[in-house]
Amino acid sequence: MKYFRADLHVHSRFSRATSGRLNIRNLAAWSMIKGLSVMSTGDFTHPAWRDELRRDLVYDDNSGLYRVREKTPLETEIPGFSRPDGVSEPQFLIQAEISSIYKKDGSVRKVHNEIGRAHV
């Protein structure tokens, strides 16, 4: 894949202010609606989320990324939507974030570092 669209800053449902319905199939469905080829998983350090990643994703030797083990039709996951023409199933990058929050000159500063990992 020469060019691709990706969302590399994602959180799992175990993070604050995220949907309780968020799971791998839901991320895959929304990525197809948005025309994304690669999604990150977010929060790979959370034990329950990591268990779901191991259960729901399978490693793709060709790309070095992961794909959904058991595909759910987009229409089933998100009623009222259908897969746009030419959009394929997304691949997943195992990812987490380190958020560094500090004060400087009386202002709060935040730096978000995204960490990718080869295997779950």
Where are the language model's segments positioned?
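Acidic/histidine-rich helix-loop elements
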Residues: 12-20
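Short, acidic/polar
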Residues: 19-31, 103
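Extended substrate/RNA-proximal surfaces in nucleic-acid metabolism proteins
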Residues: 3, 49-119
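Active-site neighborhood of phospho(di)ester-bond hydrolases with catalytic His/Asp-centered motifs
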Residues: 7-8, 39-43, 93-95
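Generic start-of-chain signal for non-secretory N-termini
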Residues: 1-5, 9-11
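Divalent metal-dependent hydrolysis catalytic cores, especially in the metallo-beta-lactamase
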Residues: 29-49
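Catalytic metal-binding/acid-base residues of hydrolase active sites
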Residues: 11, 45, 97-99
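Histidine-centered divalent metal-coordination motifs
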Residues: 9-13, 118-119
